[in-house]
A protein has these predicted regions:
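Structural preference for solvent-exposed beta-strand-turn elements
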Residues: 1-167
């Protein structure tokens, strides 16, 4: 038996298709740091804003943001930061399920599907303003480049950089 984490009195509730959630997590998990002095970089940030779930992660040098739009609107917007180990477990356990019910308060979160429930504590710090890095409406960035030339340039750069090279 596992120790009880305490009852979650849900402040926020969300229902999502498991394949959508797992896809979003797979698109962001590679940016989550394993160990960091800054705790907020060791998790995936879930932000619900009306009818959109956005999951973002950053490892200071990399940033990943993935989102999905819901058919229904949720009345309460919220942001929570979920530890990397929990993200990995969600991907592993819920990949081939139907709907996942997510309940959270300010300290912990639960993911439920069928007869499986995953509980986790939340990271209490957030990475602020990740979305400001990509202000496409204010600063549109578009580039059209030759794929072959880009791959060749990438290979040349990788030949002169190493693991010790910053940036």
């Amino acid at each position: 038996n596992f120790p009880s984490m305490g009852e979650i009195i849900p402040e926020y509730y969300l229902k999502i298709n498991s394949s959508d959630l797992v896809t979003l997590l797979k698109r962001t998990v590679f940016c989550i740091l394993n160990d960091s002095q800054k705790l907020e970089y060791t998790g995936a940030q879930f932000t619900v804003n009306r009818d959109i779930l956005e999951i973002s992660a950053t490892g200071m040098q990399r940033v990943a943001i993935a989102s999905v739009k819901f058919d229904t609107e949720y009345s309460n917007d919220f942001t929570v930061n979920i530890p990397k180990k929990t993200v990995s477990e969600i991907i592993r356990v819920f990949e081939h399920r139907n709907l996942i019910e997510i309940e959270t308060d300010r300290r912990q979160i639960s993911f439920k599907a069928d007869n499986i429930t995953v509980y986790s504590k939340l990271i209490e710090k957030f990475v602020k303003n990740i979305d400001r890095l990509f202000m496409a409406d204010k600063y549109p960035v578009k580039a059209k480049i030759d794929r072959k030339s880009f791959i060749e340039a990438s290979k040349r750069v990788s030949a002169i950089t190493s693991e010790e090279t910053p940036g």
